[in-house]
């Protein structure tokens, strides 16, 4: 892992705001090194920024646990953001500081953060980190340690293509992640808040859940009906099924439970 610390000061001699820990996903550098360089230069020019390139999940955990007062900033894809949020959640440190994000990667790999309001261009995103305002957001956490920030989906066509760029942190943490199988070929049992919504004899065509207002907005579609409801927890069981978390494929697994954590984290977004 390499690192660079660049203290910054304003012309008037005052400090340049909150110190930052800038976490660069190595996969982002391979995908678009110029955007990474631009974002790093803007961040280092406006704050006391320590730039690190963790090369494994253990290194990511270590730098986050020793960051002190520095706010974490992710330069990378949605999947890289997932891994940082997972690490902070494991360390019970998720709500301590707002998280900054500079999305870097192919278009299909950064749509979740953009959907939350993060600017598309690296300069604008970096400026939002430096001068933006934190916005509290719900986080969906599963019993395997994964997270969802915008959308969980099983079945039907995803709203966007699955990403081809894999975060190095994700590769080290979950080498078995693959494509999402067709749920109609896999009998599944679905429960929400302890209530049975679909049993194994029903073929699920679509299950979609999004965090909203401290709950999950759930859509479940079978051959005969579609149900919409708001729940706090969702459980799915089957012989082998996959799903997408913010477009990132996960699985196959046999059981998964997702729980909403209201206002669990804060994202730095453009002020106003």
Segments from the language model and where they lie:
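ATP/nucleoside-binding phosphotransfer catalytic cores, i.e., glycine-rich phosphate-binding loops
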Residues: 2-8, 205-272
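Small-residue-rich beta-alpha loop regions that form the catalytic core of phosphotransfer
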Residues: 2-153
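A generic structural signal for short, solvent-exposed coil/turn residues
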Residues: 14, 43, 66, 91-93, ...
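Catalytic core of DAGKc-family lipid kinases
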Residues: 93-217, 221-223
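N-terminal start-of-chain detector that recognizes signal peptides
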Residues: 23, 45-47, 72-74, 111-113, ...
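A broadly tuned "polar low-complexity/structure-edge" signature
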Residues: 1-8, 17, 140, 162-187, ...
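Short, acidic Gly/Pro/Ser/Thr-rich loop/turn segments
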Residues: 29-30, 156-157, 265-267
């Amino acid at each position: 892992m390499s690192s660079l610390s660049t203290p910054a000061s304003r012309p008037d001699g005052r400090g340049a705001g909150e110190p930052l820990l800038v976490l660069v996903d190595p996969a982002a550098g391979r995908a678009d090194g110029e955007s990474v360089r631009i974002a790093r230069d803007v961040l280092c020019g406006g704050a006391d920024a320590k730039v690190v390139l963790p090369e494994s999940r253990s290194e990511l955990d270590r730098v986050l646990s020793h960051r002190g007062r520095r706010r974490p900033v992710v330069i990378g894809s949605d999947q890289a953001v997932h891994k940082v949020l997972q690490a902070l959640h494991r360390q019970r440190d998720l709500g301590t500081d707002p998280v900054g994000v500079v999305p870097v990667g192919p278009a299909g790999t950064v749509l979740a953060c953009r959907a939350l309001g993060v600017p598309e261009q690296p300069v604008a995103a970096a400026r939002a980190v430096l001068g933006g305002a934190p916005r509290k957001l719900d986080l969906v956490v599963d019993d395997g340690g994964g997270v969802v920030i915008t959308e969980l989906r099983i079945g039907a066509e995803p709203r966007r293509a699955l990403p081809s760029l894999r975060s190095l942190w994700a590769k080290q943490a979950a080498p078995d992640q693959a494509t999402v199988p067709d749920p109609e070929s896999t009998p599944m049992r679905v429960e929400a808040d302890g209530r049975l919504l679909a049993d194994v004899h029903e073929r699920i065509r679509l299950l979609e859940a999004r965090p909203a207002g401290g709950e999950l907005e759930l859509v479940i579609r079978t051959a005969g009906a579609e149900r919409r409801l708001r729940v706090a927890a969702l459980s799915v069981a089957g012989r082998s099924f996959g799903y997408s978390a913010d477009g990132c494929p996960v699985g196959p697994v046999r059981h998964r439970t997702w729980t909403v954590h209201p206002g669990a984290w804060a994202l730095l977004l453009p002020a106003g």
